[in-house]
From Swiss-Prot:
It comes from the Bacteria. It comes from Burkholderia thailandensis (strain ATCC 700388 / DSM 13276 / CCUG 48851 / CIP 106301 / E264). The gene is hmgA. This is Homogentisate 1,2-dioxygenase. HAMAP family: Homogentis_dioxygen. Belongs to the homogentisate dioxygenase family.
Amino acid sequence: MERTTIMTLDFSKPGEAGYQSGFANEFATEALPGALPHARNSPQRAPYGLYAEQLSGTAFTAPRGHNRRSWLYRIRPAAVHRPFELVSGERRIVADFGDSGDVPPTPPNQLRWDPLPMPAQPTDFVDGWVTMAGNGSAAAMSGCAIHLYAANRSMRERFFYSADGELLIVPQEGRLFIMTELGRLDVEPFEIAVIPRGVRFAVALPDGRARGYVCENFGALLRLPDLGPIGSNGLANPRDFLTPNASYEDREGAFELVAKLNGRLWRADIDHSPFDVVAWHGNYAPYKYDLRHFNTIGSISYDHPDPSIFLVLQSQSDTPGVDAIDFVIFPPRWLAAEDTFRPPWFHRNVASEFMGLVHGVYDAKAEGFVPGGASLHNCMSGHGPDADTFEKASAIDTSRPNKVGDTMAFMFETRTLIRPTRFALDTAQLQANYFECWQGLKKHFNPEQR
C-alpha cells in the first residue's frame, strides 16, 4: 500500500505524491494512515468520517479478468452538487457520428491539417477542445471521437468529467498538470495520459499554453495487446505505466463542475473541490505512460512489417482479432532490413487511420506533416510515402542500417469509418493541396528491363 500526506492542490510546482507502477493492477493507496477500511469495502462507519463510494468502469458481472472498479473514500460523495444546466453556444464537440448525427458526408479523399492555432482569448483545456472526426456513438457506447485541444489558461475553479468515454490524451506542446479524484498526473510531450470515463479532473498549464490530441473511447476499455510469438516482454511493458497515489484537498468555495454527456456540455455549481478522495483501492484509475519507454520491434532481415508491431494500447471489439481502436506509435528506431523499401509502404486499408505528430518528422512524409498537425486516410483510401521520400528511399544503400531518430508520430486506427466533422472539413487548417504530394511519383515501368 502506498501512503502520502499531500493535502492541498498546488499547481505551481510538480506533484509530490508519486505513482504506483503497473497496468490495471489492484492498487491500494491512502493519504492518511488507516484511511482505507480493513478487510471490507463499505463499513458502517468509514475511517475519519469519510464516505465510501464505488466507481464502476464495467458491468458488475463482467468477467473477473475484465472487471474494472475502484472504491473511493472521500470527504463528500460525488452526488453533492447543484443540478446541471445545459451549456449553450457553439457545437464544437460531436458524439454521434451516425447518419442521424451532425456530420457531413465522408469524402474518400486523403485529408491533412495544419496544427490548431493557439487561442487569442484565455481558453482552458475544456474550452479548447474541438472534435475533428470519429465514429459510432457515445450514447451506444461504441466507437470514438477524436479531438484536438489548444489552451492557454489553467482550470482553477472548474472541474470536468466525460460520461461518454475514457480520454486518451496525447500532448504535443506544453506540459499538463492533471489533478484527478484519484491523484495527480504530471504529463509532458512524449507521454500520454488516460482518464477513465467519469473521473473528475482539472488541467493546469505550467508552461502557459498547451496543444495536443484526445481520443475519446466510447467502447471497451483500453488494454495492453497480447504479444503472441513476440513472447513475454516487448512493446509497452506493464511496469512502465504509472497510476497516481492518493492525494486530496479539503477546499470549499464557489466552483463549477462541467459534465460531458452524449456530446453536450452541462454545468453545475459545486461548493467544494471534488478532489477530496483521501484513500482508494481498485483497478479503475487514471494512468500515464512514457512513449520513450516503448520496446520497438522491427525486421532484422527484410521487409517492413505491418504497423501492428507498434501497438501500444487497444480497445477490443466483439470480433476476435479486430480491434475497435488501436493506438499505435512510430518512435525513434533503427532500420536494418536489406534490399527493402524501408519507409512505410504504399497502402490501402480496410481500417481507417487518423495520424498525429508529436515531434520531428514522420519518415513517410518529407514535408507538410508537422508537429501538431493531423492526417486522415479512411477505408481503402490510397496513401503512402510522398514522391521525395520514395525517390530517396529507393536509392539508399540498404547494406547499412540507418536510424530514424528525430520523430514521434502516432495513429488512432479504427475498424469503422472515421467521419470528419463540419469543422474539420471547413477549417482553414485543412490542406487543400495534400493530394499533390503523390502527383510527382514518376512512372518507372519498363517491360523490356526487369
